[in-house]
């Protein structure tokens, strides 16, 4: 590539007599005389052997590195971390999951700015890799592209497709006596057949789909299987497109705008995506200095139908969506009905409308994954924002497809995920109960763990349609049922959820978007006078730092909000 028609950031380390020592170091990692005028591009490589989500990423990094060199750039590969949500789920380790989003963002920002890089190609697989990378891109605002590690293919057992959620639910089924130990083990052995992120429209696939919709990843790339050759080819193509974006000086904040975030949220609704996307897009918007609130999600939910029949509540997985036309097919339907901003810029330099020009107006009739406009799965989006005296700042719930959209019942109160799971597996939760899991919020956990173990146990025990669950923690993208998370303010800061007592009547009313505690204001005032914040669970280390800095979930659980106010 020709040198860009503007000074490169990397010139501060590659040009001039004073930078001779800097160049000496760069020569040791492969730079030649002719390379010092080329753009230096960081490859944030989240390869790891601790999780199937990331085990195939090294190949993608190598393909991207070669393509960047061929395009006239100087790639520099650096590592960033990952946490396996599926492996840490239900343990103390899960407290580090959301924390890892900030560590990933901070580490990428640190390397790219610390080394004065001219561009960034980030590759991620497990859930927090995606928002962590995008937060960094929004902060840095150097030309950047995201490459998804790819989705896992479904497992198969006894004539049905399996995902990791099948294994979590099998635990509840076994505990309730509905399956044998041999069947439990068979599900365990077949649920995860190879490399790739969890296969339904769970958090990883939700975020990758949203990034494609936003224009920060290439078309069709978010639903490719990790093990297929087209995934590696897309990594190389992403590198080529990034080199062109550097030449054209297309930056993340040219792409990450209010309108493109609305596009991403619209696609999240249309594909039936994860509630975690709410938390992550609030954080991405904060990093990009784009105004966004919980109420914006509710506004978009009301106008966008669910078009895709995908797990966890539906039938199909991401690879099925890919074969049916992928995210571009979903986007074309939304664009045709005025639900996308077609003039938004993408990393390729094209607008959304230009990218979608040759995509069919309607999905193929010989598939069942993507519904046509006139026959949606649900007429409105599934991620709702609930408010009420139990969640004055708001709470997040999946409401479409719930068989019991309104539950009023006695509170069953637990101050940790572990104590709740123990009660469920012991058969102590009854139909009509409203389970409350608190002190699991951003500060209180800390880290806002996902409650997949208790929710899966409820489903597995056959209580999914008759028991409600609310928490100041989060839910996995694999969760479904009458569950309400992200309750804010959280218990640790004295939110109303801290004042709930065993047996209090609670109403979860999805159609009314209401979360109500049937206790008088006078009684709540008496309880508040008696309440005192608990001792911090951690006083040193990363969890202590996180708990001290993190904001409310209603603001994205970010760690750099109003630091100097």
From Swiss-Prot:
Residues involved in [2Fe-2S] cluster binding: 53, 126, 198
Pfam families: ILV_EDD_C, ILVD_EDD_N
UniProt-annotated catalytic positions: 476
Source domain of life: Bacteria
GO MF annotation terms: 2 iron, 2 sulfur cluster binding; dihydroxy-acid dehydratase activity; magnesium ion binding
Location of N6-carboxylysine modifications: 128
Cofactor detail note: Binds 1 [2Fe-2S] cluster per subunit. This cluster acts as a Lewis acid cofactor.
Pathway recorded for this protein: Amino-acid biosynthesis; L-isoleucine biosynthesis; L-isoleucine from 2-oxobutanoate: step 3/4; Amino-acid biosynthesis; L-valine biosynthesis; L-valine from pyruvate: step 3/4
UniProt-listed GO biological process terms: isoleucine biosynthetic process; L-valine biosynthetic process
InterPro entries: DHAD_IlvD/Edd, Dihydro-acid_dehy_C, DihydroxyA_deHydtase, DiOHA_6PGluconate_deHydtase_CS, ILV_EDD_C, ILV_EDD_N, IlvD/EDD_N
Swiss-Prot/TrEMBL keywords: 2Fe-2S, Amino-acid biosynthesis, Branched-chain amino acid biosynthesis, Iron, Iron-sulfur, Lyase, Magnesium, Metal-binding
Reaction(s) catalysed (UniProt annotation): (2R)-2,3-dihydroxy-3-methylbutanoate = 3-methyl-2-oxobutanoate + H2O; (2R,3R)-2,3-dihydroxy-3-methylpentanoate = (S)-3-methyl-2-oxopentanoate + H2O
SUPFAM superfamilies: IlvD/EDD N-terminal domain-like, LeuD/IlvD-like
Cofactor requirement: [2Fe-2S] cluster; Mg(2+)
Residues that coordinate or bind Mg(2+): 85, 127-128, 450
Task of the protein: Functions in the biosynthesis of branched-chain amino acids. Catalyzes the dehydration of (2R,3R)-2,3-dihydroxy-3-methylpentanoate (2,3-dihydroxy-3-methylvalerate) into 2-oxo-3-methylpentanoate (2-oxo-3-methylvalerate) and of (2R)-2,3-dihydroxy-3-methylbutanoate (2,3-dihydroxyisovalerate) into 2-oxo-3-methylbutanoate (2-oxoisovalerate), the penultimate precursor to L-isoleucine and L-valine, respectively.
PANTHER family: DIHYDROXY-ACID DEHYDRATASE DAD (PTHR21000), DIHYDROXY-ACID DEHYDRATASE, MITOCHONDRIAL (PTHR21000:SF5)
Family, per entry: Belongs to the IlvD/Edd family.
Quaternary organization: Homodimer.
Protein name: Dihydroxy-acid dehydratase
């Amino acid at each position: 590539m020709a040198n860009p028609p503007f000074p490169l950031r990397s010139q501060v380390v590659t040009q001039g007599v004073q930078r001779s020592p800097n160049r000496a170091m760069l020569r040791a990692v492969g730079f030649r005389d002719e390379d010092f005028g080329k753009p230096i591009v960081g490859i944030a490589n989240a390869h790891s052997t601790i999780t199937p989500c990331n085990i195939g990423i090294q190949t993608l990094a190598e393909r991207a590195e070669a393509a960047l060199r061929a395009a006239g750039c100087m790639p520099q590969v650096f590592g960033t971390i990952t946490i396996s949500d599926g492996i840490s789920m239900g343990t103390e380790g899960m407290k580090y999951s959301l924390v890892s989003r900030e560590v990933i963002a901070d580490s990428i920002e640190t390397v790219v700015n610390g080394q004065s890089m001219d561009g960034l190609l980030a590759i991620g697989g497990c859930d927090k890799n995606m928002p962590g990378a995008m937060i960094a891109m929004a902060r840095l605002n150097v030309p950047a592209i995201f490459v998804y590690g790819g989705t896992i293919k479904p497992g198969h057992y006894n004539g049905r497709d399996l995902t990791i959620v099948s294994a979590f639910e099998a635990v509840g089924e076994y505990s309730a006596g509905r399956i044998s130990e041999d069947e439990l083990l068979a599900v365990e052995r077949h649920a995860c057949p190879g490399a790739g992120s969890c296969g339904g429209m769970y958090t990883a696939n939700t975020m990758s789909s949203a990034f494609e919709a936003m224009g920060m990843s290439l078309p069709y790339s978010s639903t490719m299987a990790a093990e297929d050759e087209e995934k590696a080819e897309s990594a190389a193509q992403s590198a080529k497109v990034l080199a062109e974006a550097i030449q054209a000086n297309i930056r993340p904040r040219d792409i990450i705008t209010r309108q493109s975030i609305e596009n991403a949220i619209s696609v999240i609704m249309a594909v039936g995506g994860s509630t975690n996307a709410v938390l992550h897009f609030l954080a991405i918007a904060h990093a990009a200095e784009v105004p966004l609130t919980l109420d914006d999600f509710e506004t978009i939910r009301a106008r966008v139908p669910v078009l895709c029949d995908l797990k966890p509540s539906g039938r199909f997985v991401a690879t099925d969506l890919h074969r049916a036309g992928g995210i571009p097919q979903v986007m074309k339907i939304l664009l045709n009905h005025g639900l996308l901003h077609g003039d938004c810029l993408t990393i390729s330099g094209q607008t959304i409308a230009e990218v979608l020009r040759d995509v069919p107006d309607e999905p193929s009739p010989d598939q069942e994954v993507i519904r046509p406009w006139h026959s949606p799965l649900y007429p409105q989006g599934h991620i709702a924002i609930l408010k009420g005296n139990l969640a004055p700042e708001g709470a997040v719930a999946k409401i479409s497809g719930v068989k019991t959209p309104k539950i009023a019942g006695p509170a069953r109160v637990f101050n940790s995920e572990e104590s709740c799971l123990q009660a469920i597996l012991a058969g102590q939760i009854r139909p009509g109960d409203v389970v409350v899991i608190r002190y699991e919020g951003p500060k209180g956990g800390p880290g806002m763990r996902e409650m997949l173990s208790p929710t899966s146990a409820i489903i597995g025990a056959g209580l999914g349609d008759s028991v409600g669950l609310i928490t100041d923690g989060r839910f996995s993208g694999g969760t479904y049922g009458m569950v309400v998370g992200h309750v804010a303010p959280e218990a640790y800061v004295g939110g109303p959820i801290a004042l709930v007592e065993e047996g209090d009547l609670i109403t979860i009313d999805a159609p009314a978007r209401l979360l109500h505690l049937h206790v008088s204001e006078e009684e709540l005032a008496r309880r508040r006078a008696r309440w005192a914040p608990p001792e911090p669970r951690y006083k040193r280390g990363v969890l202590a730092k996180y708990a001290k800095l993190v904001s409310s979930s209603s603001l994205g659980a970010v760690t750099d909000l109003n630091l100097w106010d």
